[in-house]
Amino acid sequence: MASRNSVAVIALFAFVFAVISPFAGAQSLAPAPSPTSDGTSIDQGIAYLLMVVALVLTYLIHPLDASSSSYTFF
């Protein structure tokens, strides 16, 4: 019975060693480069923001223009 347990322990140790040993020679991954932003993306973001502001102002001002008495659709 003792030899059976020792064989099981040796088999378990061999299995764990076989699974872990390939990772011993593995190289660590290189760190990812830090994200950088260039001026073009910042300019594009500002342009989109200004376009949204212009669109909102257009929709806010247009109903005031349409409600005047001199405005006709045809």
Swiss-Prot record:
Residue positions of covalent lipid attachment, annotated as GPI-anchor amidated serine: 37
InterPro entries per record: AGP16/20/22/41
Proregion residues excised on maturation: 38-74
Keyword Translocase in annotation: no
Keyword NADP (UniProt): no
Primary location class: membrane
Annotated localization: Cell membrane
Membrane topology of this protein: Lipid-anchor; GPI-anchor
List of residues that carry Pyrrolidone carboxylic acid: 27
GO CC list: plasma membrane; side of membrane
Glycosylation sites recorded in the entry for this protein: 31, 33, 35
N-terminal signal peptide: 1-26
Key words, A-Z: Cell membrane, Glycoprotein, GPI-anchor, Hydroxylation, Lipoprotein, Membrane, Proteoglycan, Pyrrolidone carboxylic acid, Signal
Post-translational note: Contains 4-hydroxyproline; hydroxylated on Pro-31, Pro-33 and Pro-35. O-glycosylated on hydroxyprolines; noncontiguous hydroxylproline residues are glycosylated with arabinogalactan.
Modified residues (4-hydroxyproline): 31, 33, 35
Database matches in Pfam families: AGP
Similarity comment: family membership: Belongs to the AG-peptide AGP family.
Physiological role: Proteoglycan that seems to be implicated in diverse developmental roles such as differentiation, cell-cell recognition, embryogenesis and programmed cell death.
Protein name: Arabinogalactan protein 20
Species the sequence originates in: Arabidopsis thaliana
Name of the gene encoding the protein in the UniProt record: AGP20
